[in-house]
C-alpha cells in the first residue's frame, strides 16, 4: 500500500479483465487509486488505507454461485461512496438484500443503449440525446434491487442498468463505463469522484516532489545501482533518482550487441553529457553473440540473454563499493500482475527478460520509484523531468533486443542488415508524420533467402517483414493500415539501400492470434 499523502480511492478487484482501465480513467482525473484483489481486502486493510471512496470491479464469476467473491460486509457501513460495476453491482445488490438471477434471456454482451429513468447526480452530462451507448458483458442480471435503491436507467437486457441509494451515496451500474465502447464513461467517473470530494491533486509535479523525498528517506547516504536499458521506464527512474541523491547513483548500461542503430552511443551520450549521471558502459556484445551462436529456438535465446544479463550486470555492479540498493523501473501493472487474482498458474507465452532475480542474488534492497504509475504517467513524469518528447514517445523495445526480431540463428551479418533496414523504416514513418500514431514498429529479418533481380544480375538475399501496430496497452493490437504508396516507397528504399535484402513483406496479423514481436 502506498504511503502517499493524497486522497485515495480503493478499487476492489473481482477479476475483470478491464479492471486496470478503471484505474487509468481515475488517474486521468488526477485521482490516486489502488487496485487490490477482493480476497486481500479486509476491514482492517480498509481502515488502514482510509479511502475516500470505493469501486467494485466487474468479474467473471456468478454471484448466484455459492462461495462466489464478496466485498467485506462492513464496508457498506464505512461511510464512503461506493460504485459497483457489472459483477460489482450484482454483489452489492446481493449483499444489501437484493436478488440476482442467472441468464433466462437477459444476457447482454457488447454494445447496448441505456435510457434514463429520473435524474441522478452521478449522471450529470449523460442522456443529452435521450439515451446513452454503453458496453455490456453480463449473463446474470439484477432481478430485485436492494432496499433503499431506486432505478435511474434501463436497457433491454438490464431493467436495473443504473441504480442508486442516494442517501448513502451507493451507485451501481450493469455496464462497463471504463471501456472505450462506453463513449461517455469518463464523465460518470468524473461525477463520482467529484461527489466523493476528491481534490484532483494527483499530478506528476506533486508525485515528483513526493518521490524525491521518499527516495532520500529510503536511501539515506547509501549508494544505488540502476540497470539502464535506454528505454523510457529505466531512464525516467534513473533521472528521478539522480535528482534525489545525485552521485550516490551509478547506472550500468549493458550493451549486448542487440541494440538498434547508434542506440548505445545515443544512450551513453544523453546520460553522461546531458544529465551528468555516473554510468558504466558494459560492452559485452562479443560475450552475448558468442553464447547465442548456433541457437535458433526463441525460448533458448531469451533464457541465454536473461542469464547473461544478470551475470554481466552483477559483475559490473560488484565494482561499485558500498551499494545497498538496486533501482528498477517497475510499473504499476507489474505490481498488479504479481498479485494474481486467482493465484492459479497461467501459460507462459514468452519468458520475460528482466532483472527480477538480482535483488536477492546480490543482497540488495529495491528502489522502485515508478511502481505506482502506469506507462502514460511515466511519460508524463518524463516530461516533468525535462526529457525530450522524441525520447519519451519512443516505441517499446524488448529487453532481448534484435534477437527476437531475427528468427532462427543470429549472426553479426544479419544483425547489421536488420539495423539498417529498421533505421530506414522508422525514418520513413517519421517523415510521413505517422510515428506517434503507432504503438510499435520494427523490421524482422526472416530466416529465408529469396531470388531477386537487380540490374542484370541475380540476387539471393534475405526477405524481411515490416511490422507496425496500434494498441492502448500492448495486451491487444491491430496492424497499422499503411497506404500502398507508403509500403511501396519504404520497400523500395530498403531493397535499394540495404545490401542483403531483396524482398519486403508487411505483417498484417493482429494480437491475438499473433504476438507483436516475432519471437
Swiss-Prot record:
It catalyses: XMP + L-glutamine + ATP + H2O = GMP + L-glutamate + AMP + diphosphate + 2 H(+). CDD domains: GATase1_GMP_Synthase (cd01742), GMP_synthase_C (cd01997). The keyword Nucleotide-binding applies. Residues 8-201 form the Glutamine amidotransferase type-1 domain. Residues 202-394 form the GMPS ATP-PPase domain. It comes from the Bacteria. The keyword rRNA processing does not apply. InterPro entries: Class_I_gatase-like, GATASE, GMP_synth_C, GMP_synth_GATase, GMP_synthase, GMPS_ATP_PPase_dom, NAD/GMP_synthase, Rossmann-like_a/b/a_fold. The active site is at 86 (nucleophile), 176, 178. Keywords: ATP-binding, Glutamine amidotransferase, GMP biosynthesis, Ligase, Nucleotide-binding, Purine biosynthesis. ATP binds at residues 229-235. Transmembrane segments: none annotated. Its EC number is 6.3.5.2. One of its GO terms (cellular component) is cytosol. Homodimer. NCBIfam families: guaA_Cterm, guaA_Nterm, PRK00074.1. This is GMP synthase [glutamine-hydrolyzing].
Amino acid at each position: 500500500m502506498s504511503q502517499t499523502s493524497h486522497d485515495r480511492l480503493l478499487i476492489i478487484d473481482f477479476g475483470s479483465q478491464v479492471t486496470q482501465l478503471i484505474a487509468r480513467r481515475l488517474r486521468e482525473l488526477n485521482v490516486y487509486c489502488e487496485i487490490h484483489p477482493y480476497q486481500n481486502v479486509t476491514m482492517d486493510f480498509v481502515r488502514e488505507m482510509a479511502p475516500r471512496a470505493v469501486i467494485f470491479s466487474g468479474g467473471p464469476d456468478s454471484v448466484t454461485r455459492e462461495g462466489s467473491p464478496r466485498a467485506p460486509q462492513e464496508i457498506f457501513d464505512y461511510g464512503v461512496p461506493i460504485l459497483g460495476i457489472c459483477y460489482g453491482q450484482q454483489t452489492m445488490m446481493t449483499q444489501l438484500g437484493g436478488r440476482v438471477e442467472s441468464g433466462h434471456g437477459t444476457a447482454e454482451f457488447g454494445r447496448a443503449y441505456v435510457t434514463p429513468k429520473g435524474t441522478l447526480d452521478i449522471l450529470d452530462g449523460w442522456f443529452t440525446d435521450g439515451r446513452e451507448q454503453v458496453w455490456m458483458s453480463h449473463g446474470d442480471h439484477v432481478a430485485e434491487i436492494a432496499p433503499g435503491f431506486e432505478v435511474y436507467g434501463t436497457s433491454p437486457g438490464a431493467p436495473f442498468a443504473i441504480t442508486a441509494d442516494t442517501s448513502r451515496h451507493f451507485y451501481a451500474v450493469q455496464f462497463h463505463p471504463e471501456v472505450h465502447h462506453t463513449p461517455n464513461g469518463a464523465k460518470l467517473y468524473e461525477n463520482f469522484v467529484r461527489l466523493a470530494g476528491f481534490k484532483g491533486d494527483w499530478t506528476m509535479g506533486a508525485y515528483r516532489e513526493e518521490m524525491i523525498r521518499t527516495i532520500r528517506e529510503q536511501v539515506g547516504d547509501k549508494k544505488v545501482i540502476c540497470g539502464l536499458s535506454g528505454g523510457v521506464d529505466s531512464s525516467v527512474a534513473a533521472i528521478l533518482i539522480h535528482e534525489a541523491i545525485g552521485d550516490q547513483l551509478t547506472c550500468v548500461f549493458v550493451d549486448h550487441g542487440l541494440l538498434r542503430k547508434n542506440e548505445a552511443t545515443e544512450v551513453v551520450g544523453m546520460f553522461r553529457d546531458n544529465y551528468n549521471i555516473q554510468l558504466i558502459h558494459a560492452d559485452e556484445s562479443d560475450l552475448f553473440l558468442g553464447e547465442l551462436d548456433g541457437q535458433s529456438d526463441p525460448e533458448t535465446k531469451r533464457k541465454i540473454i536473461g542469464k547473461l544479463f544478470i551475470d554481466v550486470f552483477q559483475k559490473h555492479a560488484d565494482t561499485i563499493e558500498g551499494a545497498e540498493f538496486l533501482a528498477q523501473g517497475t510499473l504499476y501493472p507489474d505490481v498488479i500482475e504479481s498479485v494474481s487474482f486467482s493465484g492459479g498458474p497461467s501459460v507462459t507465452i514468452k519468458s520475460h527478460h528482466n532483472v527480477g532475480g538480482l535483488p536477492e542474488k546480490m543482497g540488495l534492497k529495491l528502489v522502485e520509484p515508478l511502481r505506482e504509475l502506469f506507462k502514460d504517467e511515466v511519460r508524463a513524469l518524463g516530461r516533468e523531468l525535462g526529457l525530450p518528447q522524441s525520447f519519451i514517445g519512443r516505441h517499446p523495445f524488448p529487453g532481448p533486443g534484435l534477437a527476437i526480431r531475427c528468427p532462427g540463428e543470429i549472426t553479426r551479418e544479419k544483425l547489421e542488415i536488420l539495423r539498417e533496414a529498421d533505421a530506414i523504416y522508422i525514418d520513413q514513418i517519421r517523415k510521413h508524420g505517422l510515428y506517434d500514431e503507432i504503438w510499435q514498429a520494427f523490421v524482422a529479418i526472416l530466416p529465408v533467402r529469396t531470388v531477386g533481380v537487380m540490374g542484370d544480375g541475380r540476387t539471393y538475399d534475405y526477405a524481411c517483414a515490416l511490422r507496425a501496430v496500434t494498441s492502448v496497452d500492448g495486451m491487444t493490437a491491430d496492424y497499422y493500415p499503411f497506404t500502398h504508396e507508403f509500403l511501396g516507397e519504404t520497400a523500395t528504399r530498403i531493397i535499394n539501400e540495404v545490401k542483403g535484402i531483396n524482398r519486403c513483406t508487411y505483417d498484417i496479423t493482429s494480437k491475438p492470434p499473433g504476438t507483436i514481436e516475432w519471437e
